[in-house]
Amino acid sequence: MWNLLHETDSAVATARRPRWLCAGALVLAGGFFLLGFLFGWFIKSSNEATNITPKHNMKAFLDELKAENIKKFLYNFTQIPHLAGTEQNFQLAKQIQSQWKEFGLDSVELAHYDVLLSYPNKTHPNYISIINEDGNEIFNTSLFEPPPPGYENVSDIVPPFSAFSPQGMPEGDLVYVNYARTEDFFKLERDMKINCSGKIVIARYGKVFRGNKVKNAQLAGAKGVILYSDPADYFAPGVKSYPDGWNLPGGGVQRGNILNLNGAGDPLTPGYPANEYAYRRGIAEAVGLPSIPVHPIGYYDAQKLLEKMGGSAPPDSSWRGSLKVPYNVGPGFTGNFSTQKVKMHIHSTNEVTRIYNVIGTLRGAVEPDRYVILGGHRDSWVFGGIDPQSGAAVVHEIVRSFGTLKKEGWRPRRTILFASWDAEEFGLLGSTEWAEENSRLLQERGVAYINADSSIEGNYTLRVDCTPLMYSLVHNLTKELKSPDEGFEGKSLYESWTKKSPSPEFSGMPRISKLGSGNDFEVFFQRLGIASGRARYTKNWETNKFSGYPLYHSVYETYELVEKFYDPMFKYHLTVAQVRGGMVFELANSIVLPFDCRDYAVVLRKYADKIYSISMKHPQEMKTYSVSFDSLFSAVKNFTEIASKFSERLQDFDKSNPIVLRMMNDQLMFLERAFIDPLGLPDRPFYRHVIYAPSSHNKYAGESFPGIYDALFDIESKVDPSKAWGEVKRQIYVAAFTVQAAAETLSEVA
């Protein structure tokens, strides 16, 4: 109960006042003394920081990274499956925790959450069948992939399935929908007048995220989706199938989740951590779950379905794959097969299951309340030779190198957090739940997040996706690293990267792509506004048109795949470790944060020009509805001028003054945060970055000014054009306001 001050107490209180005033004066004097002491200590610490982070420490860190260690770690991580929510993956978490402690981190903890996961039914397998007019099954798809050599006796290999597919046994005519993209369904419905309602559709993997394919099929009225990997997309010419090469065998199948979470995290606890006391929605109210059964198959089985297709011919060559079938669209089978139907048998279950992140801490010596995070996931669909363990092995070696320096008496200026995420494959759940639980700390203290999923998807050149704030950091770092590429001996990584993957916009510079989603940086960048980036080695996208790498998410993604075909010397893994680790080192140790806001100004102008050109495909409507981009271009101009002035001040200020140093660094750190709209994008409240978001039509791809882009998309087909163009105007306003507000955060503090 509160103790109230009564009238009879007032005299006593008055009598005590002089003594309290004296005490207050003493406290105030002591406070000034303490402030002076801390100011002096901070100056001393700041000066000492220049001594604990000389350039030779960066060299020592990079020199400590060893390819043979990464190779050893990868082998260790890939001998058994590590499916999220399983005992095997929990044991791997404990192993990593123990080893990170041995490496020398200050603390390593397990952070657990209880999230919704999905598994096949062990006694009722999933499959697709063709049935005759009597309902008898005359063809069934395979129940599992033939195991790769050497793995025949490995247990607990999850059979191919589409995670979070609802149960169901729909049957009906089949319709071939190409990649099941938005434009593919437009072609079917608007041009070919083919109705997918009540049909089962078959789509090939590639081009867009599988969850977008399923969403598009649902919107078209389909009652089931079959996914398959066409050789045109997953079989490179001139290369043999595994185990004799790195191509996908006919019985190989890509697993994956089919959610449409849009950044929500655990479907039952959107926006909040899935801890012990969490409120959980019922399954009917869960976020992002598909409503129709979905199942993946290999191209041998797909051929059995597609070879019987009747109906319309494919509209053009872009609808034809590499199977020896006509690629007819349907609906239904042809000729003597016209009475046959396709039936799905899906019995998977969704279960709330405990997952475990591993969080390691290396405390900063000067700014321990500023966090630089390196994170990558640990869970895999099967062995995870590339995804994710090629990344997990690199993180392990980076931690070991940092730990070695720490044992020699070194510490970073800022705190470094290392994360081994769980359940990434089930919708980025481990990283999202941890970020939700720590969102208040991260919003105040998060400097940067570097993602460390697969280290390779090819062996041709470097690939980087990051915020514009990191462009200069990446350029400067790669100029100091040696290229591992043949023909570039003695050259820098920057030189080989620029030669092999030149920027389409900026002459003499390498290509850097926008951040989309499909990986654990999503919550940090798209929701919290923490500057983020990722790097890996990739293929030649100009000549190798197939999707990603052929054995993605199949049982054949083994250690041997990497060691025999992709990186026998592990030199590309080492280079990726140097890039990822070097970025973390610079972000954690630079006196002034290595962010350049001028690069943001450049891309903002480019993005504004691009979205304006898209809008000008509708000049009459722009005029009719008085749509103007003047406010956005004005805001970009102001941002450019203020960013330039800020950069000038950044060169001239007294770096020995810890208060001014902290203030300037905070302006850099919080700039990314300034692009966050707390209300989020329309119908996607957890995507809050106004400049970048995953495409609404392909989660993997990034879109600039996404609010405006989505408002303009297919606007000519909107029922109410006045309302549609009103939304365009609103999104221009939101973008202009946000850019202007972000610019003001860089203004000189009064």
Swiss-Prot record:
Its EC number is 3.4.17.21. The modification Phosphoserine is found at residue 10. This is Glutamate carboxypeptidase 2. GO terms for biological process: C-terminal protein deglutamylation; folic acid-containing compound metabolic process; proteolysis. Changing residue 387 to E/L: Complete loss of activity. Stable at pH greater than 6.5. Changing residue 388 to A: No effect on enzyme activity. It is a single-pass type II membrane protein.
